[in-house]
Amino acid sequence: MSDTFNAVLPAEWAPQSGIQLTWPHAGTDWAHMLTEVQVCFAAIAREITQRELLLIVTPEPEEVKKQISATVNMQNVRFMECETNDTWARDHGAITMLDSEGASLLDFMFNGWGLKFASDKDNLITRQAVKVGFLNGRYVNRLGFVLEGGSIES
């Protein structure tokens, strides 16, 4: 077996199959300004769906549909109903690595910025998204390793 790891972390500008947003709700740290933040997320969703697929992770898909359906290209939206602690997909989402066999979806531990905030629900999102087919690739469990806040560089 070789010690060489021949995989790449795709650049930010590389072609992608879509974008994930984890939607703000009353149980997130946005509660004090929820309406304002949801309007901002709706504007982000509108821009994304003009160009590519969007996966919205939310415990309230019907509520989010009401918020965005008038302004967003709903043909490019997929909803995954899932309990969440917060909105930071960069912290709890999969990290995709590409090799000769295709995509590997690395699922790292998010610990809520050093256990400052709950993150137990967020740590289930990637695994569920792969299980139900919203994310395609080989699931790689790395939940024993804390990696959050965009704390990697390629």
Model-predicted regions and their roles:
Residues 1-154:
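The feature marks the mature, well-folded catalytic cores of soluble enzymes
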